[in-house]
Swiss-Prot record:
Residue numbers carrying Phosphotyrosine: 138, 143
Chief location of this protein within or outside the cell: membrane
Processing and modification events after translation: N-glycosylation is important for cell surface expression, specially at Asn-257, which is crucial.
Expression across tissues: Detected in brain cortex, hippocampus, thalamus and cerebellum Purkinje cells (at protein level).
Subunit structure: May form oligomers. Interacts with KCND1. Interacts with KCND2. Identified in a complex with KCND2 and KCNIP3.
Organism phylogeny: Eukaryota, Metazoa, Chordata, Craniata, Vertebrata
Entry protein name: Inactive dipeptidyl peptidase 10
Any one of the GO CC terms: plasma membrane
Function (record text): Promotes cell surface expression of the potassium channel KCND2. Modulates the activity and gating characteristics of the potassium channel KCND2. Has no dipeptidyl aminopeptidase activity.
Gene Ontology MF term list: potassium channel regulator activity; serine-type peptidase activity; transmembrane transporter binding
Domain of life: Eukaryota
Gene: Dpp10
Family: Belongs to the peptidase S9B family. DPPIV subfamily.
Glycosylation sites: 63, 90, 111, 119, 257, 342, 748
Amino acid sequence: MNQTASVSHHIKCQPSKTIKELGSNSPPQRNWKGIAIALLVILVVCSLITMSVILLTPDELTNSSETRLSLEELLGKGFGLHNPEARWINDTDVVYKTDNGHVMKLNAETNATTLLLDNSTFVTFKASRHSLSPDLKYVLLAYDVKQIFHYSFTASYLIYNIHTGEVWELNPPEVEDSVLQYAAWGVQGQQLIYIFENNIYYQPDIKSSSLRLTSSGKEGIVFNGIADWLYEEELLHSHIAHWWSPDGERLAFLMINDSLVPNMVIPRFTGALYPKAKQYPYPKAGQANPSVKLYVVNLYGPTHTLELMPPDIFKSREYYITMVKWVSNTRTVVRWLNRPQNISILTVCESTTGACSRKYEMTSDTWISKQNEEPVFSRDGSKFFMTVPVKQGGRGEFHHIAMFLVQSKSEQITVRHLTSGNWEVIRILAYDETTQKIYFLSTEFSPRGRQLYSASTEGLLSRDCISCNFRKEDCTYFDASFSPMNQHFLLFCEGPKVPMVSLHSTDNPSNYYILERNSMMKETIQKKKLAKREIRILHIDDYELPLQLSFPKDFLEKNQYALLLIIDEEPGGQMVTEKFHVDWDSVLIDTDNVIVARFDGRGSGFQGLKVLQEIHRRTGSVEAKDQIAAIKYLLKQPYIDSKRLSIFGKGYGGYIASMILKSDEKFFKCGTVVAPISDMKLYASAFSERYLGMPSKEESTYQASSVLHNIHGLKEENLLIIHGTADTKVHFQHSAELIKHLIKAGVNYTLQVYPDEGYHISDKSKHHFYSTILRFFSDCLKEEVSVLPQEPEEDE
């Protein structure tokens, strides 16, 4: 690799001490005018040399305080972002956790803080999670926490009296030292709910006896109030499958029945003489799915459980429930989705009678996105707001806010669109009935950022950006959370600089209090030579698609650099954003002078449905085509070394990377795939069927989308496969099938297995995991230095 040579800054230019006049016999005389001119010329030349040295000297010489980023530093405390877990407990008070572990209460009107729980409490009881009761008198402390799937975990729980220090265990009746699947406070006073052996238990307060609300729970078969794997990972994106009414008098919950769903077996190889196996229901594409029912149980007086029925169209079909929300003390709004995921019906159900009325139906020729979105209702239920796809000329459909007005007598609904444009409304946050304003996050300011906006729901529908002028050099990517009465809001700055959390008044957003600065991270970042980022827009098949390049800090366009292309983990995601990002690839950029590229091609999200849904029935081919087009563009840049290209992907990204590597286009010297999906038939039903349909009807589509089909294209590739054997999301079966086909085709590969590790590698193995990836790319991408043959010595 060409590098700028080191040059000393101390340059001395001295004139000769003796200047003789030539062609003169007379005694030496000094020509003072000539000497002065000569000295001036020498000084000018020295100045120019010094200036050019300063301009051409790399950053590491001009700023010696900056150091390169190491993996040890990346995984150390200095690079840990602190999440204060801030949440509203009423309209003026926020509860959060400081970076040193104290649990505090902050008053939004006075900025006064109160210590609720000392950090020593967590140490004393070895607790890693906590939850405060609504009356702030007690705290649930979780210890011996063991992760199950992405969101779910088991734990043992203590109830701790904040004022007296009194402690007692939370156990079901006649059970000691229990391990619970879930435990949390209700919405009023000291209400408690917990789940044990797939059944829901309820306590009106901490002194009361537990009441078992369900009895049908059965391990691995019937789940009450918590999600099975499919609902947790692909549908609810949470392990919580129950919802409190605002007054705490009712509880809605799902009963998920997996009795017909085939089980997946995950062996545990270490720690015992014979391997043990864990089984859990996992429906693959086209296989039997879980059935689901929605119930509401009355918690005051005699317990009474009522089933809320699906719309008639779904009674004889398979369906999912993807969203449940209380809109009053007795009414819930529910989203029902058919198995192909192209028909969605929104109903409002009266929990006292079980009667449900249809409010909105959506259909699609592909699939319906934003399945979990919660509508925002007015207090009297006469109007509600949610995002719907709206056509914006040739750019296709974008998600925008619609206001639905319900006629009280006829139940007819009129719709008014509040926003429009070639940008996306990400999420509706709140509706203020006093000001008639709706608050939301959108990409209007930048498709790669997120800003907080308000819009009037009456008159001219004027729209204001609330966050656009807040620390705009540091923050262009936001999230927000409003207090119950919308008088205040928390603003979460997530980039491009180090994230921070601030508290604002809705009436005067410029008046704010910084709740979390992440000062340690900020201080650490200032000492590091981190990458410079640049975003370019590529025009591919009438689409404008963003490419992000991360350059080494010492980047010079005259030099040539290796390139790493990183593929997104999920379809519908967004790689090119203004979020703060420091990860293992930052180490590679810094230590090996590699340029890292991220590209949002077709199939990516937040650029309209036309871009997103191009992959329908064409999964793997469209994404690969666009990523290859981005590589062809980069190869035209003089600073990219065409002989040193590499690719990385995890999960679905590993699948796309494999499809690219086996294609006819041979650009890459090496590639790494982590937990790669190799065949969509082997993956989750809700995921595969969303994009490809049912295997029984789309056999050729599934075959064309499989990495295992025509795998000879990988013969010339230098491939590293990494997989944990206990991966419950992308099973090791995917890598086993891939390896079997690679061996059959005579393809060389390198395999790194992590015994009993899941999709997310644990902290104890993380250093080895990242070291393996970095070492592989470092060896692959190092600059080849050709050695000139030595000439034979001549005989004397």
